[in-house]
Amino acid sequence: MRKNIVAGNWKMNKTLQEGLALAKELDAALKGRTINCDVIIGTPFIHLASIAAAIDTTRIGVAAENCADKESGAYTGEVSAAMVASTGARYVIIGHSERRAYYHETSPILMEKVKLALSNGLTPIFCVGEVLEEREAGKHFEVVARQVEEALFTLDQTDFAKLILAYEPVWAIGTGKTATADQAQEMHAHIRKSIAAKYGKEVANGCSILYGGSCNAANAKELFSRADVDGGLIGGASLSVDKFLPIIEAF
């Protein structure tokens, strides 16, 4: 079901103690407020169980930032979708541009992660996006549609409907650059059109598509006002309640 969502992505930040304090501070800040979106925080693996136990998870959903593409076994250092689910987390970020770039995660790998997440009752937040060279070459629509198609279009309609998508213009992450609200809307509409062509309009119109590129308190309201922008996947600003809360309240 299509929802407004603001999801934080802490990346590789915060010790366990710092993360627990931040999650509790956010939980306290949201208590008693009227919030018009679902709030999720994506944290490093070591935080998941402690945070899920310490906050009201009906108020704030907890997400892992990744999971393994294997079910279990001799994969030293990996964390399976089943392990993530056992912590009390309900979501997992898959396919973030940093995972694609630094750890060479390809569509076949991401497809396995999505399937394992779904089979363990997790909701994937699946990321797609183009780099600057692809946008400047006019290939951005083609690239993003292909990322969606290659990793997700083997899913049946029921499973696809469980996904949250996030569009991250890679050239706008951590650079201070932001896609304009019109650029975001244009790409989100293109993604939704691609979904409709495969699964039909009902599934496409029921899919939440978040914007994930340097979204902050100053631009969130304008971005979220666009018809196909259903919220944000927030990086740096999610590390501070003072910066994250105004984005949540932009709806």
From Swiss-Prot:
The active site is at 96 (electrophile), 168 (proton acceptor). It is found in: Cytoplasm. Pfam families: TIM (PF00121). Gene3D superfamilies: Aldolase class I. It catalyses: D-glyceraldehyde 3-phosphate = dihydroxyacetone phosphate. Substrate binds at residues 9-11, 174, 214, 235-236. It comes from the Bacteria. Its main location: cytoplasm. One of its GO terms (biological process) is glycolytic process. Belongs to the triosephosphate isomerase family. PANTHER family: TRIOSEPHOSPHATE ISOMERASE. NCBIfam families: tim. This is Triosephosphate isomerase. It comes from Porphyromonas gingivalis (strain ATCC BAA-308 / W83).
